[in-house]
Regions:
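Beta-rich carbohydrate-recognition and catalytic domains
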Residues: 30-117, 126-243, 252-309, 320-342
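Bacterial N-terminal signal peptides
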Residues: 16-26
């Protein structure tokens, strides 16, 4: 390992650190790896779930998580009314494309820590006979100062995907340090234990840079501990993920490692889809990473909405010889894409 003498000049030390960073990036890029999917194509040119009516989903239906249960596709999605209040909608499908929605949300703000803007961005992972739902409570009510608005990662459990037991906020920001200083969001749980622990990737803020990816571990899926005192995956200048590196659907275990799809945003805040491979023996170690996005906004409804130029993948289902990817378009609609299993 290259060591930088403590007496070196600031410029020399900075140069050496840059060299170290380039060596690390080269090492990641050198690992041969092919993602477990082929080219992505849209299964439908139009949204498969869109806002409707005057109620809880009148302004937005997006950022879906999908699992298969008893032969049906079950979707939880972020719903938004015209006042900006957030809740989780519920829909089912026989074919993964045409969904029937419940007339009422399956989760609304009820717990004291959820009061404010509501609950959003579900991610589902089944372990044993229990479904674990990570979601975000977001305080965005009118009149709250911008520096007081925040989001925290929460957990709920269920056996039927309808009745949920809240487990509380599961990651508390460490405001005194340099990492995980403000918001926590987007918990993507690894489906099986590694080294005797469960692992989860999530979004948080570093003091010098917002929207980085962290990693935590747990023995019971309820109580979580930071694995590192720095991000496990950082943004990269000049690339599609220069501003945001946010976990997508829960990862899958492949022969090559822990495979995670993530959502990246560039300097213009265009959101597209990347991937990263972590070591199965050490979930904090990056083995390979996408150098360009595999999916990006193209359709008008992906470019124009509540937030322009966004495809945000949160749902992933293997359906025989194909993958189904469920995503939010421009923070307003739900879309679905597919790719062959490799």
């Amino acid at each position: 390992m290259l060591k930088v003498p403590y007496f070196a000049t600031r410029a020399a030390r900075a140069s050496a650190v840059t060299v170290l960073a380039l060596i690390a990036l080269a090492a990641v890029a050198a690992v041969p790896f092919t993602p477990p999917f082929g080219k992505w194509t849209r299964l439908s040119p139009d949204p498969i779930v869109s806002p409707r009516g005057e109620g809880f989903e009148s302004a937005g239906t997006f950022n879906p998580s999908v699992v298969k249960k008893d032969g049906k596709y079950v979707m939880l999605y972020r719903a938004q009314d015209r006042n900006g209040t957030l809740s989780l909608g519920y829909a089912t499908s026989d074919d993964g494309i045409r969904f029937n929605r419940r007339p009422e949300p399956v989760m609304v703000s009820e717990a004291p820590y959820e009061k404010g803007g509501g609950v959003e961005d579900p991610r589902l992972q089944k372990v044993g006979n229990t479904y674990y739902l990570t979601y975000t409570r977001y305080n965005n009510v009118d009149g709250v100062a911008a520096d007081k608005k925040d989001a925290q990662l929460c957990l709920a459990t269920s056996t039927d995907l309808i009745h949920w037991k809240r487990q509380g906020i599961i990651i508390i920001p460490g405001y005194g340090g340099k990492w995980n200083v403000k918001w926590t969001k987007s918990g993507a749980i690894v489906p099986e234990k590694i080294n005797g622990k469960y692992w989860m990737y999530y979004l948080a803020d570093a003091r010098e840079k917002d929207s980085q990816m962290g990693v935590v571990y747990s023995e019971d899926l309820l109580h979580w501990t930071e694995a590192l005192d720095h991000p496990v995956l950082s943004s990269r200048s000049g690339l599609f993920d220069s501003q945001v590196v946010e976990p997508g659907p829960p990862p899958v275990i492949t022969p090559g490692g822990i495979f995670l799809i993530y959502n990246g945003a560039d300097d213009k805040l265009v959101y597209s889809t990347g991937w990263v491979l972590f070591d199965k023996k050490d979930p904090t170690k990056v083995l390979a990473r996408a150098q360009e996005p595999v999916f990006a906004p193209e359709k008008e409804w992906e470019k124009v909405g509540q937030v322009p130029n966004v495809v945000f993948v949160e749902g992933l289902v293997r359906d025989g010889k194909r993958w189904l990817f469920y995503y939010g378009g421009a923070d307003k609609n739900v879309g679905v894409a597919t790719a062959p299993v490799l």
